[in-house]
């Protein structure tokens, strides 16, 4: 779904650019070689993991699966999503978009290692998709994705669900 017409877009019509608190999900797609899938965002020119805000009647898991399908064309099932962190720290998760909208995201981050399909950018939110080694990420990485990789590294090292 494009931003226009989404639940968040409808709310924006009422509150303008004011701060909105919004639930969402992000998916760290990891292939068998340990590479991660990132998309180049049209709005910011930064690389980021697939993800986005929840829609009405959605859950964290359904949001993750919907965003994965919509943004990069991959299909997965809920049982293959592994939650590794929940996030809400305003220092890391308040985003001011180029148009001026201010959003504080509260979300769950999932890792996904099994899916169907080949990744393809949607052409609307993402201009391209690319696999990266986790240790060699692009300099133009969206801040929230950089935070996600730090949480994921701690999760892998400890096996403990991360809170941030």
Task: Give residue ranges: language-model regions.
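Acidic, metal-coordinating catalytic segment for phosphate/diphosphate chemistry
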Residues: 1-26, 99-100
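A generic structural micro-feature
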Residues: 19-21, 98-106, 123-126
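Short, well-ordered beta-strand micro-motif
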Residues: 29, 109-113, 130-133
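Conserved Nudix-box catalytic region and its N-terminal flanking loop in Nudix hydrolases
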Residues: 31-75
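Short helix-loop capping/hinge motifs at secondary-structure junctions, enriched
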Residues: 35-36, 116-120
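Nudix hydrolase/Nudix homology domain
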Residues: 45-46, 118-164
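Active-site segment of metal-dependent pyrophosphate-handling enzymes
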Residues: 74-118
């Amino acid at each position: 779904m494009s931003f226009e017409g989404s639940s968040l877009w409808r709310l924006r019509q009422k509150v303008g650019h004011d701060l909105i608190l919004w639930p969402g999900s992000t998916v760290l797609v990891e292939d068998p070689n340990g590479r991660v899938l990132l998309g180049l965002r049209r709005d910011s020119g930064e690389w980021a993991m697939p993800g986005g805000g929840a829609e009405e009647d959605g859950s964290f898991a359904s949001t993750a699966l919907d965003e994965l399908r919509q943004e990069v064309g991959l299909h997965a099932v809920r049982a293959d999503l592994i939650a590794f962190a929940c996030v809400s720290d305003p220092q890391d998760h308040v985003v001011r978009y180029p148009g001026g909208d201010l959003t504080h995201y509260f979300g769950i981050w999932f890792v996904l290692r099994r899916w169907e399909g080949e990744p393809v950018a949607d052409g609307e939110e993402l201009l391209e998709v690319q696999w990266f080694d986790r240790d060699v990420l692009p300099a133009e990485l969206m801040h929230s994705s950089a935070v996600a990789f730090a949480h994921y590294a701690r999760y892998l090292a400890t096996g403990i669900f991360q809170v941030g």
